[in-house]
Amino acid sequence: MPLTHKVTAMRVTDTAGNVPVASGAVSSLSDRRSDVESMMGRSTPATLSTPGTRTSTTATRTTTTRITSCAPALSADESAACHAEPSFDDLVAAYFDCRRTKRNTASALAFEQDLEHNLIALHDELVAGAYRPGRSICFVITRPKPREVWAAAFRDRIVHHLLYNQVAPAIEASLIADSCACIPGRGTLYAARRLEAKIRSASENWTRPLWYLKGDLANFFVAIDKRILHRLLADRIRETRWLQLAELILFHDPRENYEVRGDARHLAQVPPHKRLVNQAPHFGLPIGNLSSQFFANIYLDVLDQYVKHELRVRHYIRYVDDFVLLHESPQQL
C-alpha cells in the first residue's frame, strides 16, 4: 500500500440511514458574447444529468457491504460526457458552482467586475494551454484547533470546479460506499447513519459485544506525496487534456506566490510540522481547495481497497483521514 502516512490516535473500545445530492451544474451561455446581465439574472434551472453516468441512492441499511474494484475512470471521449477541450458552457457552469459559496470574497467580487471578459480570457487560456494558477491567500483558523488554510484565487477555484465536474463523477462512482466526505450525498449525516447501521448489524441490534478501532492519518494533507498521487491520477484520468490540467493543479506550489491574511501571529499557533510551508516541494496539498479534497479521496482509495480486499474487513468506514473498523474480537482488531 504506497502511502507514506502513519496511523495515530488508534484505540480499541468495547461498545454494548441517504439523499443523493444533485450536481451543481446549471445551464450556461451558449453564446460567449451574451450580455452579462442576462447571465447573472437567470435563475438556476433544473440539474442537468451527465451522459454516461447515473444517480444512485445508497440505503442506510448496511447488513451487507458493497466492495468495489479499483478501475480507471473512462476518458472524456469514451464516456461521451466531456469535450476534448473545455467548452465555454462547461466553464460557465463551473463558475456558477464556485460562486455559490464564494460570491462575497474579495477575489470573486474583483473577478465579477468584468465577468464576461474574465471568463472569455480564462477560457482562451485553458484552450491554448496557457493557463497558470495565480496567487493564493494563506490564513489561520483557530477552531476547533489552529490550522493553516490556503485559499486559491477565485479564477483558479473556477478551474478546480471545471476539472471536478468533468472527471469526478466516473471516479467517485468507483469509490467504495464507505468512503465519506467531499463526495455529493456523503456528508456527516450519511457517515453517521452508515456507521450506526454497521454497529447495529455487527452487534445484532446491540445484543452482542462489539469492539471498534478508531484511527487517523497523521498530518494528512501536508504529508501527501504528490509523486504517488500523480501516478494514481494518471491511472484514473485517461483523457490527455484533463490529465494535464490535473497535473498543473497538483504540482502548482502556492508557497511561491501567496500573501498572508488575518493576524499573522496566529501562524505561530500552528505546529511547524503541520504547516505546508515547512514541507518538501513534493509533499503536501493546500487545505481549502476543492481539488485537494477530491485528490485526497483518490489517494486514500488505496487504503479503502486494501482494507476491503486484502484485510477483508466487513465493517469499515472512513471520513477523510479518520476511519473506524468494527469487530466482535479485539484481538482481530
Where are these regions (language model features)?
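Extended, charge-enriched "interface" segments that sit outside catalytic cores
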Residues: 135
